[in-house]
Amino acid sequence: MNNALNQLQPYPFEKLRALLGSVTPNPDKRPIALSIGEPKHRSPSFVAEALANNLDQMAVYPTTLGIPALREAIAGWCERRFGVPSGWIDPARNVLPVNGTREALFAFTQTVVNRSDDALVVSPNPFYQIYEGAAFLAGAKPHYLPCLDENGFNPDFDAVSPDIWKRCQILFLCSPGNPTGALIPVDTLKKLIALADEYD
């Protein structure tokens, strides 16, 4: 059994559910759930129709990498959405459909972290819970960068020592931040890319 399992914290949404379990919302107000990012809108009709027309395929495992048409559609959307040149994103090499970000972030961390006594996974704090769990189970220690009001709720990357950067195997970033909503300035992203090149 992986000894790192003992380091895992209860998932925050379970804590939140327990805290809110005895709360009775004001009946005159509609509560706004600020927890799990589940879609609150109806699925588009073409999606519902496609699912209904393919119910006989629901018990069939998908291909490991997803069907080529899906990967091509995702690559095309990314190119349009982010303005990258056509063909820049290779659907066969750069796209992997997954069942949510937790699956992808966890698998990525297990793949790239080289277990060692000084391995660090650096993340903002507050953070998306999978960052910490993936770090522990990959044999690394989480290193938290506080997201404070005086920094616009972004980490102060200038305060990170060279020793931390040397030991950093993954830096988790999310813009807008989860859960703060803070945007990371482009100049900061460029600086972080330069640091990754320097310390890799």
PLM-predicted stretches and their roles:
Residues 1-4, 15, 167-169, 191:
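Terminal low-complexity, poorly structured segments
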